[in-house]
């Protein structure tokens, strides 16, 4: 009997999640006991609709394109799972002779992976989690695939914006980085600094409480000294009470969709300090950029 593999993507994609997918197919082809490698089309919900694609049916030339393709080639989701759902999965896995279930995602996906493992451990079905998140906040990992490319993007973007602001030093530019409650991406902007005075000039992380008055004082002092100022802020900034400095747009099961922190702070600078300011929010560009994909990140994702 063939032992098939099922790969499921969960949560937000990255610039290298497809490299992990390629790595799975590559390794499966080396093992004669493995039959097909299925991809769940559209994430976790595809398990219940049994919407699978046979990834081993593609030739090597096409599969290698995955290494340099952004986002998720098989689709992802934030499909909510409940206790009753996990038992249903076992029957579906058996129906398709799936002996290996590989879930590629962040914290929410790893949580689901644990639940699926519990219902499969006595059914001779192996469940494995493949780490993925630009936020770099998965427990017990030094760093996760996806973060390196996002870090490279924000560092390169900060360096370029810094040169722009330096050449016309008349305003404050506030750049907002993704990462939710983790400041790893925002902190990576410091890699743009090559010499004293280079951007970013100020960095604000969600690991510390944010004080608007102190922020305005910092900006005013630097702007008076050097003219142009580049500030990096995290989308997850919060005050001393733990409240987001900008109310979230909305919340779903596990995810919080933050408001425009950079726009809010730029408006504060204009209104309170009378200084020209603008906001930049790369957003999804920062996790989808293949142009700035890290080769190290890609190889680590492939091996993950």
Residue ranges of predicted features:
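Short, ordered loop/turn segments at secondary-structure junctions
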Residues: 10-12, 40-45, 78-79, 106-107, ...
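Gly-rich Lys/Arg/Thr-decorated short loops/hinges at beta-loop-alpha junctions or inter-strand turns
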Residues: 4-8, 65-76, 132-142, 167-171, ...
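Short glycine-rich or small-residue beta-strand-to-loop segments that form or flank ligand, phosphate
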Residues: 4-14, 72-76, 99-104, 172-177, ...
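Glycine-rich oxoanion-binding loops at beta->alpha junctions
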Residues: 47-99, 108-110, 134, 145-152, ...
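N-terminal phosphate-binding or glycine-rich loops at protein starts, especially the Walker A/P-loop
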Residues: 1-51
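Accessory alpha-helical/coil subdomains and C-terminal extensions
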Residues: 103-105, 111-115, 119-120, 124, ...
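C-terminal active-site/capping subdomain that shapes the small-molecule cofactor and substrate pocket
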Residues: 269-304
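Short glycine/serine/threonine-rich phosphate/pyrophosphate-binding segments
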Residues: 14-24, 47-48, 82-87, 106-115, ...
